[in-house]
């Protein structure tokens, strides 16, 4: 089947959505707006940069909304088409696709990996996707609800056996859903709070995770059984975690109360799901004791049942399930979790493992008495769900900046009459911290007064310890140190954990209930990470602590700040080198490395396809254990639909298996070559951002100042007032360049690096780069991700934004430098890859972009005009509203902007 034929169903869906949206816009806003939308849709090539029709303010706002809604509907249709193509592959019996479990496992089998080796890896594996709240998540929950309705009706329209009457009825439902979206405000008229973000974060579990994760485990066990002929009972090593409600560095509004609220709200979602499933099992398991026996444990549960109706006397499974529902309600009540049901006074479960025990008793009884088929359905899925989600739904990470920890430790020392902590050098800090960690005495005294920040931080750690007692130790798993630069930064966190009981002494040995995770973010910190970890592992006290964590040490790597600090190529290379060095440090120390990749949605923040990125990791850096962040609008794109969520989680697991056990060629890289490229790229990037006036240029040539005024997220755009890019958070930095369509963080510096290398080494140098591209997954992924950025960028639209800069000489100078680097980067890409055009090897993405670009370009041009108007009239709320519409529409069209 040709690529054209494969896309016919997608084009049919888009035509249907386009027609219905045109009808809605025409009926609601009139022919002028509807005609303008259709005119934009037909713009091609150079026409896309032509001026747009002048409309009255209200009509212009409607035009912006229509462009944005078209992008949203396109995303829905495209996601459904991906699901449809995957299903078509499976029905046709085609070879498994790259990134799928069957493909990954077949490769391992062909590589000679034994069942024992695979099972051993999975027995100690840990794969995590961690949801984070970010200011680039621009869509309201109400809009996402509307998207689900559109997705549902469009999917039903694709059924092959619809009658004309059924099709007409479904189209009417679809049009109503589009009309409801049109009449729903997509703009938040209030600033989001952390509570709002917590509510949004848990919304994806009933949408996708409750269905997708158990299905993924079943599929993995089935595929292993078919390929190796052995039964695989796997532990629950795949987890979805969260930062929402625990990330104080990301959001200074987070406190102990919000941490408790986050876990309680998550727990509520888990309990409601379990009770719903128990009720469904109650309806299904109507087995009569007259016809089939039940095990002793089931009968014991049945005897405790509050359901004493005569009609239930011979239905032991239903009575047992009634007992379990009562115990579960009592468990929720004990933990302060509100449920929309009556409470029960019976004994609660002490932890989720007791619930699993009861469910396992039902399963064993069914299997022992000829009903294994019943045990393998909903009951089996529920057992897996409880094992994965526990009573806390998602493990929550805590994160805070190293400087904040340092301040709290300094205050504790001062109040206790100890050394002036801030005045100590690194060696002295390590010495006094180890001294305090080795003694049972606490520094905190309830009889002394502490500063507001110290009280707040200590309260967070105490609340974390209480949450572990209430919901299980896994409910709070990691404590992350942002901007970690030294051993003392890690030990300072350890001391605060000790003050709260998260680290304690047992028989003189330190024991921790959380992982202490250094986050290396800047280029300098990445370079120093090897020395920090080697010095940490040399401490006898820390060696003992590591023993209590099965010698597993997590290290987080920051893609966003390293990119903002050093540019795209240097960031990628420094991350690679840091991983390679850490693998050796950990091997020397006999520790098990678990890397946590702080990747964003955009390429400038480490984004790109997860499968390719993981498979291209340095040898030994995965070893069955990896966590990655899922941020901003990427969460919606990846996890709002069960099939798509399942595919993304499957790719994460497949890549982990291949990177850990597979024979991946080209894992080595030419260190000298990349050192040279990195040095040139870094010099070019720093020369740009250190140009006098660059910060003024950035503030005026992007919508960053307007973004700061919008009600997108709950956290500030910067940690302090802006005087340099170092003061700016990485997310608005990347987000703003994406909105102006320059995408600078995803490519700048690569062109200069390649040009300098080829100038020095001649044709042989270019040949070496071409050879490296063909054989190095690391280099392939780097250039492939950059290619996607270049394809989405538009220099013409970026030039319009540059014209907003008041200092025309500064604008001409800086945009001239950017344009020159842009051309160098294009030349370098084509010279190395041999391609004639961008996305030559990815026709699906190329066609997708071609369809989106007319609307994306129109939104970009309008945004630039609106920014000029806002700067002339800063208090014009209508203009700010219109800018917000362009930001929403551009985000939807690009799909990964921050």
Swiss-Prot record:
Pfam families: PEPcase. The active site is at 134, 564. It is an enzyme of class 4 (lyase). Gene3D superfamilies: Phosphoenolpyruvate/pyruvate domain. Keywords: Carbon dioxide fixation, Lyase, Magnesium. Its EC number is 4.1.1.31. GO terms for biological process: carbon fixation; oxaloacetate metabolic process; tricarboxylic acid cycle. GO terms for cellular component: cytosol. It catalyses: oxaloacetate + phosphate = phosphoenolpyruvate + hydrogencarbonate. GO terms for molecular function: magnesium ion binding; phosphoenolpyruvate carboxylase activity. Its cofactor is Mg(2+). The keyword Lyase applies. Belongs to the PEPCase type 1 family. Forms oxaloacetate, a four-carbon dicarboxylic acid source for the tricarboxylic acid cycle. PANTHER family: PHOSPHOENOLPYRUVATE CARBOXYLASE. This is Phosphoenolpyruvate carboxylase. It comes from Chromobacterium violaceum (strain ATCC 12472 / DSM 30191 / JCM 1249 / CCUG 213 / NBRC 12614 / NCIMB 9131 / NCTC 9757 / MK).
């Amino acid at each position: 089947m040709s690529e054209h034929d494969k896309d016919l169903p997608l084009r049919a869906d888009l035509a249907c959505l386009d027609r219905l949206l045109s009808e809605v816009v025409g009926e609601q806003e009139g022919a002028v707006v509807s005609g303008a939308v259709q005119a934009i849709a037909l713009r091609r090539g150079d026409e896309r940069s032509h001026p747009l029709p002048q409309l009255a303010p209200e009509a212009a706002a409607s035009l912006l909304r229509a462009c944005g809604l078209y992008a949203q509907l396109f995303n829905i249709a495209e996601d459904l088409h991906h699901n449809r193509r995957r299903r078509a592959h499976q029905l046709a019996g085609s070879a498994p696709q790259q990134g799928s479990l069957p493909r990954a496992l077949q490769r391992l089998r062909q590589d000679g990996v034994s069942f024992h080796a695979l099972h051993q890896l999975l027995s100690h594996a840990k794969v995590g996707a961690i949801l984070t709240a970010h200011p680039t998540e621009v869509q309201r929950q109400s809009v996402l609800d509307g998207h689900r309705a559109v997705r549902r009706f469009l999917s039903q329209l694709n059924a092959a056996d619809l009658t004309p009457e059924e099709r007409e009825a479904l189209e009417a439902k679809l049009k109503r859903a589009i009309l409801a979206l049109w009449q729903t405000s997509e703009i938040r008229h209030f600033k989001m709070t952390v509570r709002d973000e917590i509510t949004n974060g848990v919304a994806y579990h009933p949408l996708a995770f409750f269905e997708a994760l158990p299905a993924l485990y079943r599929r993995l066990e089935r595929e292993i059984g078919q390929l190796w002929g052995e039964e695989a009972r796997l532990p629950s090593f795949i987890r979805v975690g969260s930062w929402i409600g625990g990330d104080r560095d990301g959001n200074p509004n987070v406190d102990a109360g919000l941490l408790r609220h986050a876990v309680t709200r998550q727990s509520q979602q888990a309990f409601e799901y379990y009770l719903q499933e128990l009720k469904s099992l109650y309806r299904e398991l109507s087995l009569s004791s007259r016809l089939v026996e039940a095990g002793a444990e089931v009968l014991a549960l049945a005897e405790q049942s509050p359901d004493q109706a005569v009609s239930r006397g011979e239905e032991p499974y239903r009575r047992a399930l009634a007992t379990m529902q009562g115990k579960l309600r009592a468990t929720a009540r004990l933990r302060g979790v509100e449920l929309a049901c009556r409470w029960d006074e019976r004994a609660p479960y002490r932890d989720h493992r007791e619930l699993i025990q009861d469910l396992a008793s039902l399963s064993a009884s069914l299997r022992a008495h000829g009903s294994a088929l019943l045990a393998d359905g909903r009951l089996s899925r529920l057992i897996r769900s409880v094992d994965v989600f526990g009573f806390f739904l998602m493990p929550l990470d805590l994160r805070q900046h190293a400087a904040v920890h340092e301040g709290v430790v300094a205050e504790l020392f001062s109040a206790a009459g100890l050394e002036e902590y801030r005045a100590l050098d690194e060696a002295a800090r390590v010495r006094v911290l180890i001294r305090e960690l080795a003694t049972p005495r606490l520094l905190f005294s309830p009889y002394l007064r502490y500063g507001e920040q110290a009280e707040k931080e200590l309260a967070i750690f105490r609340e974390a310890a209480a949450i572990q007692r209430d919901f299980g130790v896994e409910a709070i798993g990691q404590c992350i140190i942002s901007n970690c630069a030294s051993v003392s930064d890690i030990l300072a966190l350890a001391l605060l954990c000790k003050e709260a009981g998260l680290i304690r002494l047992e028989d003189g040995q330190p024991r921790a209930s959380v992982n202490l995770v250094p986050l290396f973010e800047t280029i300098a910190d990445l370079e120093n990470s090897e020395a920090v970890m080697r010095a940490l592992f040399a401490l006898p006290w820390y060696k003992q602590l590591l023993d209590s964590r099965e010698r597993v040490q997590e290290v987080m790597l920051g893609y966003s700040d390293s990119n903002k600090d050093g540019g795209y190529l240097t960031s990628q290379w420094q991350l690679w080198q840091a991983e390679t060095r850490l693998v050796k440090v950990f091997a020397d120390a006999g520790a098990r490395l678990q890397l946590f990749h702080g990747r964003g949605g955009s390429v400038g923040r480490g984004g790109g396809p997860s499968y390719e990125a993981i498979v291209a990791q340095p040898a030994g850096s995965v070893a069955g254990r990896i966590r990655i962040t899922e941020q901003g609008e990427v969460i919606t794109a990846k996890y709002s639909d069960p099939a798509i969520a399942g595919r993304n989680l499957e790719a994460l697991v497949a890549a982990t298996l291949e990177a850990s056990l597979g024979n991946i060629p080209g894992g080595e890289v030419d260190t000298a070559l990349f050192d040279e490229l990195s040095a040139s790229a870094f010099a070019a990037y720093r020369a740009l951002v250190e140009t006098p006036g660059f910060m003024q240029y950035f503030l005026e040539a992007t919508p960053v100042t307007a973004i700061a005024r919008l009600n997108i997220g709950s956290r500030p755009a910067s940690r302090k007032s802006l005087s340099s890019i170092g003061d700016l958070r990485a997310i608005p930095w990347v987000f703003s360049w994406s909105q102006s369509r320059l995408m600078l963080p995803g490519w700048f510096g690569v062109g200069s690096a390649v040009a300098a290398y080829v100038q020095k080494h001649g044709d042989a140098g270019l040949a070496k780069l071409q050879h490296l591209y063909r054989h190095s997954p690391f280099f392939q992924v780097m250039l492939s991700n950059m290619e996607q950025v270049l394809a989405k960028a538009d220099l013409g639209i970026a030039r319009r934004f540059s014209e907003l800069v008041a200092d025309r000489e500064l604008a001409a100078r800086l945009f001239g430098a950017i344009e020159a680097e842009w051309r160098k980067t294009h030349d370098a890409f084509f010279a190395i890859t041999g391609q004639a055009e961008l996305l030559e090897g990815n026709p699906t993405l190329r066609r997708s972009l071609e369809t989106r670009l007319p609307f994306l370009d129109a939104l970009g041009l309008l945004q630039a005009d609106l920014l000029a108007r806002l700067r002339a009239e800063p208090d014009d709320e209508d203009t700010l509203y219109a800018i917000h519409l362009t930001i929403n529409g551009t985000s939807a069209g690009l799909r990964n902007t921050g």
